[in-house]
Amino acid sequence: MSPHLIYVVGPSGAGKDSLLNWLRAKLPAASPLRWARRTINRPATAEGEDHESVSNEAFSFLLETQQLAMHWSANTHQYGIRYSELLPLPQPSWVFVNGSRAYMNEAVASHPGMKVLHITAERHVLQQRLLGRGRESLENIEQRLNRTPHLNIPAGCHFMEFLNHDPLEVSGPKLLKALTALPGWPAA
């Protein structure tokens, strides 16, 4: 049985990674939910995402040998999801894919039935969060926010939008409640 795929996208500052980490920490380890590990051509860091770090050459080899079910470029890096990350478990399963808005339509086309979860926030909230990180100047943040792509949602796509304006201890349970409304979502 194929897993249910949830392709998660959102702009920088929306809290996508924080919410995914919250879900990972709160859901039982024995649940049929898992997170596809990304393959990225950047070094792994202790405080960063647990991804498979590969060189540019290794990433090119994975593409040439068709070992990636999904792949895209963003922020000077190459991202991919190996086919093995999308394999079903013995029981019905759900797989979260931390994806890209720019690649969303291609992902939906190549994985029929995939659900898209768009985690976002109003512009002023995104700006405040990005400023709080202290990684970019206000000018760079404004440029980032101005180039946010418009989402063209494919026909027939199960699309969910989650506005994340609240603190994590409020937004995490709200997101989980929204996910439990999906048909076939595992009982707690």
Provide a role label for each language-model segment.
Residues 8:
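Hydrophobic anchor at the beta1->P-loop junction of P-loop NTPases
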Residues 11:
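P-loop (Walker A) phosphate-binding loop of NTP-binding proteins
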Residues 14:
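ATP-binding Walker
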Residues 17:
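Walker A/P-loop
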Residues 38-95:
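ATP-dependent small-molecule kinase phosphotransfer cores
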Residues 95-99, 110-132:
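Conserved phosphate-donor/acceptor-positioning beta-strand/loop module used by diverse small-molecule
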Residues 132-182, 186-188:
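Small-molecule kinase domains that catalyze NTP-dependent phosphoryl transfer to phosphate-bearing small molecules
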